[in-house]
Amino acid sequence: MIGRLQGILLEKQPPEILLNVQGVGYELLLPMTSFYDLPEIGQETTLFTHLVVREDAHLLFGFAQKTDRTLFRELIKTNGVGPKLALAILSAMSVEQFAYAIEREELSKLTKIPGVGKKTAERLLVELKGKFKGVKQSDFFVESTHIPLSPSIESHSESSSDEAISALIALGYKPVEAEKMVKRVAKPELTSEQVIREALKAAL
């Protein structure tokens, strides 16, 4: 099992990256909450990882924090929640925001995430409620303000919007829905990562 990788960031196209680890290129899928914290192309980064083995593919998921990976592993234990849906959940909410929604039983927030219907949201509440009691109340509202500006991502509004739409579709949103989400928040000065962040925030 690959649990942690440290290497040079070669490519990033939300939600995927290519990481060079001693000459070997690893393709990883990251939730957007981890993607926001990536350095610029060519710089070193360290990610906690989880490998999912399927008949048709081996998928490697990366996380900026160990707590993100822990929640990912808890999510995929839930009936009806696969790795891609867990990725969408962690892209829409930070660990703290998700924990708060679970402890407050906020079904409406959970069902706004693509792929999470009422039954899935109810299962998440039943199976995960109480597992976040160790998290302080103040921690529920912690939100990273760091948004890296990467020269590898074209800041032109049309290019940023197209990349943001593609990323949202990859996370499970329907094309029409993704386009509407991006149009509501897109500004010429925003990078694609910033557009995605604002679109996901507005969706909740």
From Swiss-Prot:
SMART domains cross-referenced by the UniProt entry: HhH1
Predominant subcellular localization, coarse grouping: cytoplasm
Region (Flexible linker): 144-155
GO molecular function per UniProt: ATP binding; four-way junction DNA binding; four-way junction helicase activity
Highest taxon listed in the record's lineage: Bacteria
Keywords for this protein: Cytoplasm, DNA damage, DNA recombination, DNA repair, DNA-binding
InterPro entries, A to Z: DNA_helicase_Holl-junc_RuvA_I, Hlx-hairpin-Hlx_DNA-bd_motif, NA-bd_OB-fold, RuvA, RuvA_2-like, RuvA_C, RuvA_C_sf
Example of a GO biological process term: DNA recombination
Region (Domain I): 1-64
Region (Domain II): 65-143
UniProt keyword annotation of DNA-binding present: yes
Family to which this protein belongs: Belongs to the RuvA family.
Description of how the protein assembles with itself and partners: Homotetramer. Forms an RuvA(8)-RuvB(12)-Holliday junction (HJ) complex. HJ DNA is sandwiched between 2 RuvA tetramers; dsDNA enters through RuvA and exits via RuvB. An RuvB hexamer assembles on each DNA strand where it exits the tetramer. Each RuvB hexamer is contacted by two RuvA subunits (via domain III) on 2 adjacent RuvB subunits; this complex drives branch migration. In the full resolvosome a probable DNA-RuvA(4)-RuvB(12)-RuvC(2) complex forms which resolves the HJ.
Function (record text): The RuvA-RuvB-RuvC complex processes Holliday junction (HJ) DNA during genetic recombination and DNA repair, while the RuvA-RuvB complex plays an important role in the rescue of blocked DNA replication forks via replication fork reversal (RFR). RuvA specifically binds to HJ cruciform DNA, conferring on it an open structure. The RuvB hexamer acts as an ATP-dependent pump, pulling dsDNA into and through the RuvAB complex. HJ branch migration allows RuvC to scan DNA until it finds its consensus sequence, where it cleaves and resolves the cruciform DNA.
Protein name in UniProt: Holliday junction branch migration complex subunit RuvA
Organism: Haemophilus influenzae (strain PittEE)
Gene this chain is encoded by: ruvA
